[in-house]
Amino acid sequence: MPDKSKWVYSFGDGQAEGAADMRNLLGGKGANLAEMASLGLPVPPGFSITTDLCTAYYDNDRQYPDDLKSQVDMALTAVEEIVGAKFGDPEQPLLVSVRSGARVSMPGMMDTVLNLGLNDVTVEGLAKQSGDERFAWDSYRRFIQMYGDVVLGVDHYEFEELLENLKADKKHTLDTDLSADDWKILVGQYKQKIEEVLGSSFPQEPAEQLWGAIGAVFGSWMNARATTYRNLHDIPHDWGTAVNVQAMVFGNMGEDCATGVAFTRNPSTGENLFYGEFLVNAQGEDVVAGIRTPQQLTIAGREEQSSELPSMEEVMPDVFTQL
């Protein structure tokens, strides 16, 4: 394909190449991330690969334009400079998330990969850098599970079965009860399972991981559930999805970290009140997977839900005030 277009738009450190009115090109998520970065909000740096690229990808037998790789490499270098870490570096590794982002919301229809960039070497660097071996190996097992499912096509339940068996062997109920050594055992089991199913090993090269994830997100635009969703909601198939690559921020580093979702209004009633929920010591997929009961952000939300779990407003007041 000829080199003729700008396919990648960067954002972060108070600047962005995109804006909120570019959702047709950058997808809803990419456009809003760009807008928030421009406003100076603390958005982790990253870049969006455009919906036009998705269309070109399918128009040309799932082949990328010749100039895409160089644009991605430049954008990734910019993220490295902002974060002060390097993709694939054994001492100070940059880890990223790879997410879809259509111009309209299609919740749960397409694919996401977190903690990308971890391997047998960088996990040691993350453990040393964070001072938390358990967190590093927890992040690695999460990455292998998501990448194995989303990119490599190993059934999610293959990994869940191994996790549940390990918890049973250790007589634990919650994932958070498992130690660093437990996660190391599970990482080995996950990699062995991938080898058994595919006849090939889990990819250790971060660049290979990244392009695998980008391809999986573009591929998920045409998966059965996404296609059915678009048919049901009259969303054109030729709109395509963007891909958003962003530096990781970790909610699973301990009891003073969390992940969640937030709304400026109550999505059920439309009432103009801050609303949302969170999980302590978790990552995003834990919220949507329903494996733990989330806590409400506000006291009012906790009372509305008749929840006995304390709200963020009560247990993390400084973080709540920032939100």
Sequence positions of predicted segments:
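Nucleotide/phosphate-binding sheet-loop regions of phosphoryl- and nucleotidyl-transfer enzymes
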Residues: M1-L323
